């Protein structure tokens, strides 16, 4: 924060769990290129003033506004699903325990890469020495702001699972807080880096993380 700062913080405050009132919140969004967003939150007080449950889910879909002329399909779209729950237990005025669990599934297209292969680079050299197709070079490319021509689909298959447990104990003089978290990440991403209809440089990489 302030002058010459190279970093900062983003504080995301979620909707709190209600211990007193049942309720629901639903929002729908639709737009061009197959845009469809659905967000839902449901509040369920299980024991009045003591135990409550919040359920949530969201879905984002978008076909993408860039046309791949080689594959004859729209690319650059989104396909994300998020769901989970938060439970809050407050047996006394000075103690509460919250358990949060959620899953994020992301099968979005990993971008729409344009052909930037200059003369002297391998994808362009293949074209110059007679290999097909004839537009491996940027100078021969037909792509633009809403059109690409890579031969591969930049797909993803990612799943993120998170658990957070928070306990607060207030002694009037001090507030003691314990936070436990666990996150599992399973990722697969395919990216066609050459951006041309030349079957040359693509990466299909996998990550499996736990923290």
Predicted region positions:
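Outer-membrane beta-barrel translocator/receptor signature
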Residues: 2-69, 73-83, 94-95, 161, ...
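Outer-membrane beta-barrel domain signature, strongest for Gram-negative TonB-dependent receptors
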Residues: 72, 78-211
């Amino acid at each position: 924060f302030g002058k010459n700062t190279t970093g900062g913080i983003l504080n995301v405050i979620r909707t709190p769990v209600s211990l007193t009132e049942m309720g629901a919140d639903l929002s729908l969004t639709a737009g061009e290129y197959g845009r469809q967003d659905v967000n839902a939150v449901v509040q369920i007080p299980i024991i009045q003033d003591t135990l409550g449950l919040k359920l949530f889910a969201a879905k984002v879909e978008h076909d993408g506004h860039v046309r791949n002329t080689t594959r004859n399909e729209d690319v650059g779209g989104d396909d994300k699903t998020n769901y989970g729950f938060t439970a809050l237990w407050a047996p006394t005025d000075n103690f509460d325990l919250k358990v949060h669990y959620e899953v994020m599934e992301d099968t979005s297209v990993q971008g729409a890469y344009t052909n930037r292969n200059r003369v002297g680079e391998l994808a362009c050299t293949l074209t110059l020495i007679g290999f097909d197709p004839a537009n491996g070079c940027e100078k021969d490319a037909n792509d633009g702001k809403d059109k690409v021509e890579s031969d591969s689909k930049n797909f993803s298959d990612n799943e993120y699972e998170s658990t957070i447990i928070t306990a607060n104990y207030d002694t009037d003089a001090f507030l003691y807080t314990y936070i436990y978290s666990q996150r599992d990440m399973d990722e697969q991403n395919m990216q066609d880096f050459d951006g041309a209809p030349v079957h040359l440089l693509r990466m299909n990489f996998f990550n499996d993380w736990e923290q």
